[in-house]
Amino acid sequence: MNKERKGRFNDVISSLEEAKGEVEDILNEEQDSYDSLPDGLQMSSRGEKMQDYICLMEDCISKIDEVVGFVEEKIIKKK
């Protein structure tokens, strides 16, 4: 792969990091919302759904990190 095409992956990483930041913002908002619920509502189906989404967003962030690491290690740094 030539340097120009390989260099474009830096833009891909920037886009992924930006998306990760957005997901983190949404995650933090949802976590704050969940934390402000009374204990009884946290244990309700609504609270459980919120927890499910929080877990999914944490997984999403982890997957983005995996992709960024893969691109950096296997594509950008490969000679």
Where are these regions (language model features)?
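Long, low-complexity or tandemly repetitive, helically biased scaffold regions used
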Residues: 1-79
